């Protein structure tokens, strides 16, 4: 959860397609954006959604206004990240305090029916460094220009 003022602008974290934009139970007004490689971001308790299902959005584009709809007692954004439906901590890729992107790529492995997200990628084939980076991202500001985040899905033999 990210504390906000009433009706602050929520922006898309990456390029993608809006999969859901509607009132949804305890989440209140919700926007779910599907990005490349199975990544989804979710933004809920919105006062007003500015996009609808099927809309194509760019990184940094306004998608909603913050609120406290659903099961919420104060204005905030409930922000989730998912890979193929599995939740993972957004702090693995975002530094919300500094407004930067922590990683340029992440590694996902399947453990039975669960997807495990890691940030250390020992594979020599990956040109991008998995070390922490300080790239601004558009959740708060439209300065992150890449618009997408590489996600490496490895099977058990490649671990």
Question: Across the structure, where does each feature detected by a protein language model lie?
Answer:
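Peptidoglycan cell-wall recognition and remodeling modules
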Residues: 41-47, 68, 72-75
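C-terminal soluble interaction/assembly domains
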Residues: 43, 47-62, 159
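Short hydrophobic beta/alpha edge segments that flank linear recognition/processing sites
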Residues: 2, 30-31, 57-72
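Acidic, glycine-rich catalytic/binding loops that coordinate metals and/or anionic ligands
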Residues: 52, 80-159
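Short glycine/threonine/proline-enriched tight-turn/helix- or strand-capping micro-motif at secondary-structure
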Residues: 1-12
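A structural signal for short beta-strand/turn segments enriched in small hydrophobics and glycine
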Residues: 10, 16-18, 54-66
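Short polar/acidic secondary-structure junctions
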Residues: 7-9, 22-24, 68-71, 82
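Zn2+-dependent peptidoglycan hydrolase active-site motif and core
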Residues: 12-50, 80
């Amino acid at each position: 959860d990210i504390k906000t003022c009433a009706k602050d602008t929520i922006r898309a974290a990456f390029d993608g397609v809006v999969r859901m934009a509607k009132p949804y139970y305890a989440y209140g007004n919700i926007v779910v954006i599907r990005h490349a490689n199975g990544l989804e971001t979710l933004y809920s308790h919105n006062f007003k959604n500015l996009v609808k299902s099927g809309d194509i959005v760019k990184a940094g584009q306004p998608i909603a206004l913050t609120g406290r709809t659903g099961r919420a007692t104060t204005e905030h954004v409930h922000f989730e990240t998912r890979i193929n439906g599995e939740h993972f901590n957004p702090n693995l890729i975002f530094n919300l305090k500094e407004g930067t992107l922590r990683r340029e790529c992440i590694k996902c492995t399947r453990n039975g029916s669960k997807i495990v997200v890691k940030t250390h990628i020992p594979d020599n084939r990956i040109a991008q460094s998995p070390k922490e980076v300080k790239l601004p991202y558009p959740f708060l500001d439209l300065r992150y220009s890449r618009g997408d985040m590489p996600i490496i899905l490895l099977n058990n033999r490649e671990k």
